[in-house]
Design a protein with these regions (language model features):
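A broad, low-specificity signal marking well-ordered, structured residues that form hydrophobic/aromatic
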Residues: 2, 138, 178, 194, ...
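A conserved regulatory-domain signal marking ACT and ACT-like small-molecule sensing domains
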Residues: 284-394
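Intrinsically disordered, low-complexity boundary segments flanking structured domains
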Residues: 164-170, 261, 276, 298-301, ...
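Generic beta-strand/beta-sheet core signal
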Residues: 6, 36, 141, 180-182, ...
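Nucleotide/pyrophosphate-binding catalytic subdomain
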Residues: 1-259, 264
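Short phosphate-binding/catalytic loops that engage adenosine nucleotides
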Residues: 29, 272, 338
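Terminal amphipathic helices with adjacent charged low-complexity linkers/tails
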Residues: 35-42, 46-53, 64, 227, ...
Length: 394
């Protein structure tokens, strides 16, 4: 059994979605197909919600644009009139729900995280119905029923055990071709719609592959695989044939956007290979990610970078030789759900610099200033110094 994930560009045009159909129908094995929203729709859903929140009536035109795009897609790819009629009925119902939510946001000028999560869920809900109707013999399964999250530090995180059991139960008697919306989930306790974050469709596919001990996880995208560098910057970059899980994770963490980083862990534990393939060039070998690369003659696999980096420096003469300062830094940040992806310490031990995302910078500075408030007051340490708008190259 295989799990195939198709991203937004792979379902974003008539050409790409028909290529998806050919790829899936050409599989002899059982396959579970995880799909993202049509390319650009998630961003459009978010932008439209902000217009509605601000009382801007142009949100209605944006909503109608999304409707039209989905209707045009259905009209272009579904020939069977009976199937088309049934699909359009489902899409009409979903858009009526979404229209009501937007109108509510417009009226009361409130957009809570719960409502925002519900709004962005419609992208995958719509695309999965389209793909399930397009692929002959396919059955749609609703990931809201089996991908479960819990709240930690104010953020929704996967409840791995509950989800794994629910996935096994859901697909116990699966059909040969199954279609699943990626990205979306529900809170284990409240049942409210949540999601796995941007790139979460990759994660959905990995979770399912691991729970069902799949033969392989295939990530279908718009590139031939991992490249030795960003081809937009380095024109001589070429596709990497094989990577280890660790190498792929490093490249992903440092800006290679081919695979969402959390995707790797669930399948790595089960030793399930990941293949990154190109929907527009399905005959290309792509990149295979596995536990160990044999006969590896190239110690440096690739170069990647992260834009939007903030470097925060924790400094003070009192830090020299003092045990536990770094523990306090990382504990304080972790308790507030802030991730650190780079650390550098001066040889004299009087300063430690950490890399965080620009979007987390303001909160990180506040957290650390609070953690070391006593030391800052006495002059033993300096207030936190942050430099934003940087890039990390690795």
């Amino acid at each position: 059994m295989k799990v195939l994930k198709f991203g937004g560009t792979s379902v974003g045009s008539v050409e790409s979605i028909l290529s998806l159909k050919k790829i899936v129908e050409g599989e002899n094995d059982d396959v579970i197909v995880v799909v993202s929203a049509l390319g650009g729709i998630t961003d459009k859903l978010i932008a439209t919600s902000k217009l509605a929140l601000g009382g801007d009536e142009s949100y209605k035109a944006e909503f109608e644009f999304m409707q039209k795009r989905h209707y045009e897609m259905v009209d272009a790819i579904i020939d069977d009139e009976e199937k088309k009629s049934g699909l359009l009925h489902t899409i009409d119902r979903l858009f009526e729900e979404l229209k009501s939510i937007y109108y509510g946001v417009y009226l009361i000028h409130d957009l809570s995280p719960k409502i925002q999560a519900a709004i962005v869920s419609y992208g995958e809900r719509l695309s999965s119905h389209i793909v399930a109707t397009l692929v002959n013999g396919a059955k749609r399964y609703n990931s809201l029923d089996f991908i479960k999250t819990i709240k930690k530090h104010g953020k929704n995180v996967l409840d791995s055990e509950v989800t794994a059991n629910a996935v096994k139960e859901t697909f116990r008697n699966r059909t040969q071709k199954s279609v699943v919306p990626g990205f979306i989930s529900t809170d284990r306790n409240t049942g409210e719609i949540t999601n796995l974050g941007r790139g979460g469709s990759d994660y959905t596919a990995s979770i399912i592959a691991a729970a069902l001990d799949a033969e392989v996880l295939e990530i279908w995208t718009d590139v031939d695989g991992f490249m030795t560098a960003d081809p937009k910057v380095i024109h001589t970059a070429y596709t990497i044939n094989e990577l280890s899980y660790v190498e792929a994770m490093e490249l992903c963490n440092f800006g290679a956007k081919v695979v969402y980083p959390p995707t790797i862990y669930p399948v790595c534990v089960k030793n399930i290979p990941i293949k990154v393939k190109n929907t527009f060039n399905p005959d290309s070998a792509g990149t295979t990610i596995l536990s160990h690369v044999e006969n590896d003659s190239k110690p440096i696999k690739g170069i990647s970078s992260i834009k939007g980096t903030t470097l925060i420096t924790v400094a003070g003469l009192s830090m020299v030789g003092v045990i536990g300062v770094n523990r306090r830094i990382f504990t304080a940040l972790a308790e507030n759900g802030i991730s650190v992806f780079m650390v550098s310490q001066a040889s004299s031990e009087n300063s430690t610099s950490i890399g965080v995302r620009d979007v987390d910078a303001e909160e990180a500075v506040a957290v650390l200033n609070n953690e070391f408030s006593k030391e800052i007051r006495t002059g033993a340490m300096f207030p936190m110094h942050a430099e934003s708008g940087l890039a990390t190259v690795a």
